[in-house]
């Protein structure tokens, strides 16, 4: 699919073999591949075949295979792709179910289940928290959030991302961008509760 003037391709279709050929072209310059989206796990059979092909190729099997996901994949889905992946980065956009439904239109229970399952199987690379001023509820639920994080593998990185208005649309276009002071406050509250492996943005807009 392309824009009306066909000047900016929006989607490209590849077979697994074609994507492997592209991966092989750049293999000498990369340490791994990360599939993102949208939500990449919506194409789970393709991802399984792609990761499986990487792990089966002598010249590619050194590459890590990571998934950037919203965490809504079922546990059965994670079990299917787990043998061929090296890790996942998962977004937890709020702590309470009510706030998560407000922000995304869906419950976060499956996301929490995904996070726990991936951590228990040494497949959770990074847990991401998106701070949206006056919207997210991390600080209001800091005790529960910290307890949850501390129940995970201690090697997991916690990344706090700052919401910004660029590229968003709809109601979110009117939401305030997060600033450094707000991110540092959340970071400090987590550190006080023994959550230590935290990354914060280098640039704020």
What are the roles of these predicted feature ranges?
Residues 1-84:
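Conserved Radical SAM active-site core
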Residues 8-15, 35-45, 99-115, 133-144, ...:
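Conserved non-cysteine loop/helix-boundary elements of the Radical SAM core domain that shape
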Residues 31-33, 65-67, 88-90, 125-127, ...:
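Hydrophobic faces of well-ordered beta-strands that scaffold small-molecule active sites
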Residues 40-42, 71-78, 88-104, 130-135, ...:
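Conserved radical SAM core fold
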Residues 48-60, 119, 150, 187, ...:
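Surface-exposed amphipathic alpha-helices with a cationic face
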Residues 82-88, 122:
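Glycine-enriched alpha-helix->loop->beta-strand junction motifs that scaffold or abut catalytic
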Residues 133-205:
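Auxiliary Fe-S-binding modules of radical SAM enzymes
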